[in-house]
Amino acid sequence: MMARFVSVSSCQFHFGFREVSPPSVTSYPRRFEVSDRRFPAIPIKCSSSEPENGEDSAPSLSSSSSSSTSEVSTSNSSTYNWYTGIGGIGMLDTAYLTYLKVTGSDAFCPIGGGTCGDVLNSDYAVVFGVPLPVIGFVMYGVVTALSAELGEGNLPFGISKSNGRFALFGITTAMASASAYFLYILSTKLSGSSCLYCLVSAFLSFSLFFLSVKDVKLQEIQQVVGLQICLAIIVVASLTASYSTAQPIPSRSGDIELPYFRTEISSSSSPYAIALAKHLNSIGAKMYGAFWCSHCLEQKEMFGREAAKELNYVECFPDGYKKGTKILKACADAAIEGFPTWIINDKVLSGEIELAELAEMTGFSLDQANETNQLQ
């Protein structure tokens, strides 16, 4: 009977004693007699208010949930910052490759014969008539823009964040699949040719893919793994169809023999260039190059015929180049990695350098040029 009067809410108990009169005796089949005793009466005061510790626990749970949400948000923001940074680097890399492709120039002459120019000028650098670096630039641009929008949580066209993440996952999957295929082409069809910038682009694509795998939960990946496989197959099939008529280029390092030839300099030298060349020679500056290197010839053209003769130029392959040919010992001792390379005051400088820059870094002035001309 007591259970009917006890509320489940928190109760305050006040103990007291109340005198209870003895009940009347009634005859029953079995008679019980109750003696005159004092029974403790327990008045129960019930309150509908929540206990104080309950009030304290609610804010603590809310605070814990808020802290957890904040940590997840910070982690996602950091991930999208990585996306944006890597995508930006990829845009710079492919923009430079696009410039090389459009102008037909080469980035830097390596010690071996194969260069980025060989790769970019091959049939494999074009996909359905579009230069491959241009496609790469667009893809990196999309990744950079999409990741930046995801980081801010402000996607266009009403796209949800979940759909944005899956779109990013799909794009990076396509990029990684294409990069894997290009590495296969580079190692088989373009064997012997090297392109550092192409390898950097492939590395960046794989990095973006692994980031997206980490960003998308395993359960979500299992839901779309079939779609991702189909996407990779479509990318590879499309590239194969585009390259069906492409012809592999011979390996410079193994299939071609380059006999040594003397390069002809067509430009004439100015008095300033002649004086600068003599100054560089006097301070021990050396230019290391190879006869096949177009950049080496362009550097000499800056000086002109007469001034180039005054330079301390070191030809690293004076006997020509073929498979097994070793670089000149002087070049090997100087640890030359590409052409042209300048060593000025023990400082290694790679690539072509403008005359004004050479003059500035060696302390050559116009007055010295005038003095040299007067002596002549």
Curated annotation (Swiss-Prot):
Phenotype on disruption: Severe growth defects due to a limitation in the electron flow from PSII.
According to the UniProt entry, which residue ranges have a biased composition of type Low complexity? 57-77
Q: Which cysteines are joined by disulfide bonds?
A: 109-116, 195-198, 293-296, 316-331
Q: In its keyword annotation, does this UniProt entry include Plastid? A: yes
**What Pfam families does UniProt report for this protein, alphabetically?**
VKOR
Gene Ontology biological process terms, A to Z:
photosystem II assembly
Task: State the residue spans of region: Disordered.
Answer: 44-77
Effect annotated for changing residue 293 to A: Loss of function in catalyzing disulfide bond
What does altering residue 198 to A do?
Loss of function in catalyzing disulfide bond
Membrane-side (Lumenal) residue stretches: 103-125, 187-192, 245-376
Compartments (UniProt record):
Plastid, Chloroplast thylakoid membrane
What GO cellular component is one of the record's annotations?
A: chloroplast thylakoid membrane
Outcome reported for the amino acid change (mutating residue 195 to A): Loss of function in catalyzing disulfide bond
Q: Which keywords label this protein?
A: Chloroplast, Disulfide bond, Membrane, Oxidoreductase, Plastid, Quinone, Redox-active center, Thylakoid, Transit peptide, Transmembrane, Transmembrane helix
What does the record say mutating residue 230 to A does?
A: No effect on catalysis of disulfide bond
Q: In which tissues is it expressed?
A: Expressed in cotyledons, rosette leaves, stems, cauline leaves and flowers.
Q: What is its EC number?
A: 1.17.4.-
- One GO molecular-function entry: NAD(P)H dehydrogenase (quinone) activity
Q: What class of enzyme is it?
A: oxidoreductase
Query: Where, in residue ranges, is this chain on the Stromal side?
Result: 46-81, 147-165, 214-223
Per the entry, what this protein does is: Thiol-disulfide oxidoreductase catalyzing disulfide bond formation of chloroplast proteins and involved in redox regulation and photosynthetic electron transport. Required for the assembly of photosystem II (PSII) through the formation of disulfide bond in PSBO, a subunit of the PSII oxygen-evolving complex in the thylakoid lumen. Involved in the formation of disulfide bonds in the lumenal protein FKBP13. In vitro, reduces phylloquinone (vitamin K1) and menaquinone (vitamin K2) to their respective quinol. Cannot reduce phylloquinone epoxide to phylloquinone.
Q: Which family does it belong to?
A: Belongs to the VKOR family.
Quaternary structure (record): Interacts with the PSII subunits PSBO1 and PSBO2. Interacts with TL17, TL20.3, HCF164, PETJ, VDE1, EDA3, FKBP13 and FKBP20-2.
Q: What is this protein called?
A: Thiol-disulfide oxidoreductase LTO1
Give the organism the record lists.
Arabidopsis thaliana
What are the leading ranks of the lineage? Eukaryota, Viridiplantae, Streptophyta, Embryophyta, Tracheophyta
